[in-house]
Each structure stands twice: as structure tokens, then as C-alpha cells.
């Protein structure tokens, strides 16, 4: 299944995602896979605030299902994905 759907992320994460794609010249789907693979810890939840403003982004249904399965903290998917994108942006 390679269908795309939309999900939400914070405005900051959206800007970080754009910067990562421009800096690395990697396609959107690759950057999303890298972000989803990032581990989010309890300290990340406390250390990195996520704004309430949201933007929609494209994601494959498989990637969204993976993200939901990795949501051990049972937090909002938008917050979880925003944290993962932020952690990836710290490495770029």
C-alpha cells in the first residue's frame, strides 16, 4: 500500500522539514522516513515544546501506520511527528 494521506505537524516542524529538504536535497518521502525512525524519549517530551499551530503534510499510509505503532507515549500524532522532525533537524 503506497497511498498518501495528510497529517498535521507544528508550524516550527513544517519550517524545519522544509529546511532539511532544501539543505539535503532529499525527497520528501525519504526525509519523512528518516524523521519517523528517530526515537523520542521522555526527556524530549519535556525539553522541546510544540506549538499549537498546525500545518498539513503529505505522508504515506504505511508511514502513518508505523508512526502510530511507535507512539508508546500515546500522545497526539502531530506532536510526536513534530518532535521527530525537530530531532532530525538538530542533525542537519
Regions found by a protein language model. Give the residues of each.
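Short, basic amphipathic alpha-helical segments that act as recognition/interaction helices
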Residues: 20-49, 73-92
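Short Lys/Arg-rich basic patches
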Residues: 1-15, 21, 41-65, 71, ...
